[in-house]
């Protein structure tokens, strides 16, 4: 009996010591302020009874919203802004959670992307790490600048519109003379072809001009060095390479065919034959048929009056018609050596093509 009593007393003492250590830790966490310590513990007890509110998001709409914390914003200011954007139900509950978790002094200034499916804890921990503040944006191979502008609007996270970016894209290289000179780009050119297809992680404060600079820098990184030197050694400017590569990009389904399709077009150019490239007719039609890349007819080959229509205009079109991939660019710089002058999509829908030397052979491949 005495032994059991001693064990009980020992356990009780250890329990009291544990409580004391925990109390000291919490006291230290409250900056040694006894009033704050007591207040925090009372809030902690209150939150325990409201756990379901903490764990329940305000809605089901997962559309990202831009949310900005300015330098010097207090937890109360942040909470009120979240409430006004309909991201939380209770501003006071958010502030209380920050305080109990020790996050009220950890909020970082920046622009974040939040949605209604996030709980108060989710939002709180997002707002203490500025690394959560970014825009993911993808430019697809074969997209024209109008489609990039549409993607900007569809993304919904940029601080500018697609139309505002279009104004920058259409201005072209007026304030980038060194870039234009390096790649042989005429001063009249837009950014078409140079919005390098890639998935980008961008700062939320990026401007339309900043996006342009990022895309062009990525393009330069991809094509500079040996590729640029090899193109120039063949007597081609990079602008001419990108122009033809944009056509190859729109024609090819499989990257492995890029250098073969490129060889067809280069062979035609060498003998003065028109390129007869369907994508250039589509480009000339703009969005007149409700899509940027419409189906075309035999009549369109002659009736679409555009300098880009390579059925009625010899040589290369005035410039690129879309953003080519690096694979398409390399296909034009390093084409397969062939004696092909024609190609036709295979009838099985595989995306592959049949290549031929003569027009008569080409006709035999018609579906």
Residue map of PLM features:
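Signal peptide-directed extracytoplasmic domains
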Residues: 32-222
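Short non-domain terminal segments
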Residues: 6-10, 135, 163, 306, ...
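N-terminal hydrophobic or amphipathic segments with adjacent small-residue motifs
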Residues: 12-17, 66, 136, 345
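Bacterial extracytoplasmic/cell-wall-associated proteins, especially those involved in peptidoglycan
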Residues: 20-27, 156-159, 171-367
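Generic structural signal for short, solvent-exposed loop/turn connectors between secondary structure elements
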Residues: 1, 131-134, 366-367
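N-terminal type II signal-anchor transmembrane helix
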Residues: 2-54
């Amino acid at each position: 009996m005495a032994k059991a009593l001693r064990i009980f007393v020992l356990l009780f003492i250890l329990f009291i010591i544990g409580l004391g250590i925990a109390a000291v830790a919490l006291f230290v966490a409250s900056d040694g302020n006894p009033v704050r310590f007591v207040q925090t513990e009372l809030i902690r007890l209150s939150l325990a009874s409201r756990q379901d509110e903490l764990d329940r998001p305000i809605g089901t709409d997962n559309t990202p919203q831009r949310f900005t914390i300015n330098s010097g914003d207090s937890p109360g200011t942040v909470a009120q802004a979240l409430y006004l954007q309909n991201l939380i139900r209770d501003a006071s509950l958010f502030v209380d959670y920050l305080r109990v978790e020790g996050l009220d002094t950890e909020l970082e200034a920046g622009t974040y992307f939040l949605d209604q499916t996030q709980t108060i804890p989710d939002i709180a921990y997002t707002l203490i790490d500025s690394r959560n503040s970014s825009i993911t944006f993808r430019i697809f191979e074969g997209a024209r600048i109008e489609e990039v502008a549409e993607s900007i609007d569809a993304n919904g996270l940029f601080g500018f519109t697609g139309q505002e970016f279009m104004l920058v894209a259409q201005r072209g290289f007026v304030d980038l003379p060194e870039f234009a000179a390096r790649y042989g780009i005429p001063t009249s050119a837009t950014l078409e072809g140079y919005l390098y297809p890639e998935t980008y992680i961008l700062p939320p404060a990026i401007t339309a001009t900043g996006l342009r600079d990022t895309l062009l820098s990525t393009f330069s990184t991809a094509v500079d060095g040996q590729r640029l030197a090899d193109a120039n050694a063949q007597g081609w400017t990079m602008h001419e390479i990108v122009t033809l590569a944009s056509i190859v990009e729109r024609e090819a389904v499989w990257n492995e065919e890029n250098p073969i399709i490129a060889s067809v077009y280069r062979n035609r150019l060498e003998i003065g034959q028109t390129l007869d490239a369907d994508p250039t007719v589509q480009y000339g039609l703009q969005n007149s048929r409700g899509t940027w890349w419409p189906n075309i007819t035999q009549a369109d080959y002659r009736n679409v009056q555009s300098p880009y229509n390579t059925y009625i205009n010899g040589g290369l079109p005035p410039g690129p018609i879309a953003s080519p991939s690096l694979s398409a660019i390399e296909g034009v710089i390093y084409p397969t050596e062939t004696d092909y002058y024609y190609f036709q999509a295979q009838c099985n829908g595989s995306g592959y093509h049949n290549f031929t030397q003569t027009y008569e052979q080409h006709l035999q491949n018609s579906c």
